[in-house]
Amino acid sequence: MVAGRKAFALQAGDALSPDKPAEAQPAQVKTDLAANRQDAVFRYAQNGVQVTKTITLHPRNFKVDVRTEVRNGPAQVNMLFPGLGKADNPRVQAVPVGGQPASVQGSGTLSVQNIQYAALQENPSQIAHALIVRPQQGTKVDVQLTGGPQGLVTATLPATSSLEVYGGKNELIHLYQSGYTELPGLFQPNFFGQISLLIVKLMEALYKVIGNWGLVIMALTILLRLVMWPLMQAQGRTTARMQLVQPLQKEIQEKYKGKTDPESQRAMQMEMAQLMRDYQVNPAGCFSTLLPFPVLIALWATIRNFEFDSGFLWLPDLATPDPFYILAVIYLFVNLGQLYVSTRKTPEMFRQQAMIYLVFLYFALTFPSGVTLYIILSTIIGIVQQIIINKQVEHETASLGQTVQKVAPGTRPASKTTVTKTIDAPKK
């Protein structure tokens, strides 16, 4: 994460010079898996100066607590934070307490006194990284920022100091879970990021009540389905009516098969339009299917980057794919069930679209298991809702009993004499 081996290295002129020998004691390491932390204490002496450095790792949120104590030495020491691994030209900035963000342009240098934080950052992405230094326990820290290909933060600390250092992804959810999104000028979430923040805050609120992340995702799925029910109901009714209309559309198309003259084509379009009006089908209703996608995209990004501290059932980590592929199999059958409910009046369409879900199976194999769990439960709820809507629409169309004029095959519409038959259809 941090370039080189000099991260957390102390300097203080001749007193702590890397060129002079030092006497180091064996490190004392203590691991607490329950608390998800590891403590290491390093002690060494150089030129009569005694240094005790305590490092506490918090792996799940990429944080490191660094506490230093320097005895028999200078009142202030420098701690180096050199670069971001292989990152090229990271952004180097700092924010003084009560001040505005200040950053280095190009390969220049800049001094900032009494910082709230200092940071090295790549442009935000899934593979970008950040290093953030934040004083703790009232420690006053001044920094010198150095720009350029690697970037460098040199922090001037008192002899006894406490720092919190973040070394992880420069990504919204990781920064939020580590408590850094409230820092001014550090990260500006986009539209999907704002949705992700709402989702993760809702997940945390549910976790306080439920206490299990798998159940939290299931509860979140139900809540989102309830919120989106008006939109999904409109889309479901459009789907149900289209199932009833499609066989009649094929009859009209068959009726005008082989007739390419403008009058016949115009007549076919008029009959199609009349059929859609009779069955109250709004072609724009299908666009409501796109509305849940921003939520799904934000949820995918949230769960993929969320650091869960427990698994669910056979799933060791909800942020990683199912290692046993059980969810992928369930995903396939559930989606085929949804496809059947949506195309039950047109079996040939079911056969055509069923192959597409074999392609979608790849996503179920690679998606975080928490996202796949959400999709499966959401789809099951959608199937139940669609069955209810189908019955409602069929009841409506059967009870209205309106006569719809249909031009018999082989005849011309409009001014020509037409043959009609009566079918059950909804009123206009």
Curated annotation (Swiss-Prot):
InterPro entries: YidC/ALB3/OXA1/COX18, YidC/Oxa/ALB_C, YidC_ALB_C, YidC_periplasmic_sf
Keyword tags: Cell membrane, Chaperone, Membrane, Protein transport, Transmembrane, Transmembrane helix, Transport
GO cellular component, one term: plasma membrane
Domain of life: Bacteria
Biological process (GO), any one: protein transport
Subcellular location: Cell membrane
GO molecular function: membrane insertase activity
Keyword NAD found: no
Record Pfam families: 60KD_IMP
Transmembrane spans: 209-229, 283-303, 323-343, 356-376
UniProt key word Cell membrane: yes
Membrane topology: Multi-pass membrane protein
Subunit relationships: Interacts with the Sec translocase complex via SecD. Specifically interacts with transmembrane segments of nascent integral membrane proteins during membrane integration.
Function: Required for the insertion and/or proper folding and/or complex formation of integral membrane proteins into the membrane. Involved in integration of membrane proteins that insert both dependently and independently of the Sec translocase complex, as well as at least some lipoproteins. Aids folding of multispanning membrane proteins.
Family of this protein: Belongs to the OXA1/ALB3/YidC family. Type 1 subfamily.
PANTHER family: CYTOCHROME C OXIDASE ASSEMBLY PROTEIN COX18, MITOCHONDRIAL, OXA1
Protein name: Membrane protein insertase YidC
Organism: Deinococcus radiodurans (strain ATCC 13939 / DSM 20539 / JCM 16871 / CCUG 27074 / LMG 4051 / NBRC 15346 / NCIMB 9279 / VKM B-1422 / R1)
Lineage per the UniProt record: Bacteria, Thermotogati, Deinococcota, Deinococci, Deinococcales
